[in-house]
């Protein structure tokens, strides 16, 4: 059994009295030193299950110290194309668990350098944005977001290919959609407008991305995040009923007028009164 395990530190056994057995003779030492080393020949172990490539990097992200094992890293790179045989669900589960590690930066850089990341996520790129995001958020979805460019369709396509949960796919797409409206120089009114149009989570995720791009602006980013997460999105204060009272028949004109009202209401930072007058002015604009 030990000879077919993936890593030497996974080939440890204990009896009912707590005595540890280490058939490879290296498992205990590996665990103590943070070494992730395949049992026997790395390529043989990988060919038994190509998911072991991702497990190598996932275990390293969580438990590894020092440089990744050179032989294991080389074998992962050499056999990376074999991961195309894996189900998307198995791949995405390993990737998200890796990204949830306290500090996955070295593991992700090693994956990219070995050509493994490109096999599972060719759209992704590690670099300063991802590295900064790891220090700002422990959320694996925020970290994954910073591997992608700001492109909603690309993000959706990649998420669908990986068969990420619908909630994760939709969250990534919403953040990409909100990103053009979000920046660290936003006014408070701009933040409220963005939250109203894009929802709190999407704006907060986009702000994390902007913060990772400009980590020196931490104080401003924190303030904007607190505002976005603390502001309660108000309901639209008027609807078709109010327009009907002004003589507007249901139909396309109703939608146009409500959209015009909403745009003005947002631009004025969500005033709480004067709605009837504003709506009446849209229905019967002043002449002159």
Regions found by a protein language model. Name each.
Residues 1-71:
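Acidic, glycine- and histidine-enriched catalytic cores of nucleic acid- and nucleotide-handling enzymes
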Residues 2, 49, 56, 107, ...:
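A residue-level signal for conserved active-site and pocket-lining positions in enzyme catalytic cores
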Residues 19-38, 210-288:
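Charged substrate- and nucleic-acid-binding regions of tRNA-handling and nucleotidyl-transfer enzymes
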Residues 26-32, 71-80, 87-90:
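Short, conserved phosphate-binding/catalytic loop or strand-edge motifs used
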Residues 46-50, 85, 101, 229, ...:
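Conserved phosphate/pyrophosphate-binding and hydrolysis machinery centered on Walker-type P-loop NTPases
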Residues 54-61, 99, 112, 258-262:
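Short, amphipathic alpha-helical segments that act as regulatory/interfacial helices
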Residues 73, 108, 169-177, 222-225, ...:
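Short, well-structured alpha-helical segments
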Residues 81-219:
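Conserved, hydrophobic alpha-helical core segments of structured domains
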């Amino acid at each position: 059994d030990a000879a077919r395990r993936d890593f030497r530190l996974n080939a440890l056994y204990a009896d009912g009295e707590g005595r540890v057995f280490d058939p490879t003779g290296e498992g205990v030492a590996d665990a103590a030193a943070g070494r992730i080393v395949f049992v026997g020949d790395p390529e043989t172990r990988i060919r038994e299950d190509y998911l072991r490539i991702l497990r190598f990097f996932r275990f390293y992200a969580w438990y590894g110290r020092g440089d990744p094992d050179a032989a294991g890293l080389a074998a992962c790179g050499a056999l990376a194309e074999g991961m195309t045989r894996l189900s998307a669900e198995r791949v995405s589960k390993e990737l998200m668990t890796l990204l949830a590690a306290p500090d996955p930066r070295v593991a992700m850089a090693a994956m990219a350098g070995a050509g493994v990341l490109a096999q599972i996520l060719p759209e992704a790129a590690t670099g300063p944005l991802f590295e900064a995001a790891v220090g700002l958020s422990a959320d694996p979805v925020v970290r994954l977001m910073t591997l992608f460019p700001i492109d909603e369709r690309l993000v959706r396509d990649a998420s669908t290919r990986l068969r990420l949960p619908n909630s994760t796919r939709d969250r990534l797409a919403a953040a990409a959609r909100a990103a053009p409206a979000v920046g660290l120089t936003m006014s408070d009114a701009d933040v409220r407008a963005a939250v109203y149009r894009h929802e709190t989570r999407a704006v907060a995720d986009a702000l994390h991305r902007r913060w990772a791009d400009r980590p020196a602006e931490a104080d401003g980013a924190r303030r904007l995040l607190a505002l976005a997460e603390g502001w309660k999105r108000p309901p639209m204060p008027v609807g078709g009923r109010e327009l009907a009272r002004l003589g507007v028949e249901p139909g396309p004109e109703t939608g146009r007028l409500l959209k015009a009202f909403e745009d003005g209401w947002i631009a004025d930072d969500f005033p709480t009164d004067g709605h009837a007058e504003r709506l009446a002015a849209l229905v019967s604009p002043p002449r002159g």
